[in-house]
Amino acid sequence: MRVIRPVEHADIAALMQLAGKTGGGLTSLLANEATLAARIERALKTWSGELPKGEQGYVFVLEDSETGEVGGICAIEVAVGLNDPWYNYRVGTLVHASKELNVYNALPTLFLSNDHTGSSELCTLFLDPEWRKEGNGYLLSKSRFMFMAAFRDKFNEKVVAEMRGVIDEHGYSPFWQSLGKRFFSMDFSRADFLCGTGQKAFIAELMPKHPIYTHFLSEEAQAVIGEVHPQTAPARVVLEKEGFRYRHYIDIFDGGPTLECDIDRVRAIRKSRLVEVAEGQPALGDYPACLVANENYHHFRAALVRADPQTSRLVLTAAQLDALKCRAGDHVRLVRLCAEEKTV
């Protein structure tokens, strides 16, 4: 059974393997053992209540409960920008007009922004290519909503997610090449590494301080503003179906979109509910896939089951109960994995 659980120190080797498969551009999952070890330690200190809100971050892994193999990672930052500034570009408009000359130009413009300061962030989502089947990607992404629903007081009103922008297999980013490189005087991979290892002071020191007309960028760079990496496109669709929207904020490095949603409007959070669990053989039937998660903060588990999403009593096998770290009589959180398609 594939389950989501909190990260552990022993996961470092598996996370190094995952980091080596990202293809670059995933700033929060670099193949750097010291950085990953520090990330794990920060997550464990978050669970133990040792960190202030601005440093808190949860990390989860997707594990095969029978073999112990790890095939994916996902994370939540509790409140971004409280320690280090959180930068985006806001894609806005400046109008230049002259009645005398009968000229009116509305120009797309990039404005440096800290508007998402204090928001909770979904981040570090990566699934091993060999595991991209059987709903694993949905489980990995949406399990975080089950954790947020169970422990709502730990998170803020707005949730954001930075989507990886367009970068080729050689690490070439059209947006960075046309804009960032002119100010930072380094390749995208170098800037990405510095940011991923926590060396972020250079951003504030070297960022352009004034609005930038997108017409001054190359056509190639303009074309990728707000667009996602091909491997990230499915993740974007998943979040949009949960209620997330692109509100014209983009990443300062690769131009990828930032999606956002009020936490209480996220479908899986809003529609999830607690049901009693019982041991037995689940009833046969054409039931949809559902997310199920325990309510145990320190030993959180989430998995997929086939069930009636409206049931008040969820029947699970002994193996499923064991994998979810719960017993008959406990209450678990249940929600349909995907929103029902509207029919006319």
From Swiss-Prot:
Annotated SUPFAM superfamilies: Acyl-CoA N-acyltransferases (Nat)
Location of the active site: H229
Function summary: Catalyzes the transfer of succinyl-CoA to arginine to produce N(2)-succinylarginine.
Gene: astA
HAMAP family referenced in this protein's UniProt entry, alphabetically: AstA
Organism lineage string: Bacteria, Pseudomonadati, Pseudomonadota, Gammaproteobacteria, Enterobacterales
Catalyzed chemical reaction(s): succinyl-CoA + L-arginine = N(2)-succinyl-L-arginine + CoA + H(+)
Source organism of this protein record: Salmonella typhi
A GO term for molecular function: arginine N-succinyltransferase activity
Matching Pfam families: AstA
Name recorded for this polypeptide: Arginine N-succinyltransferase
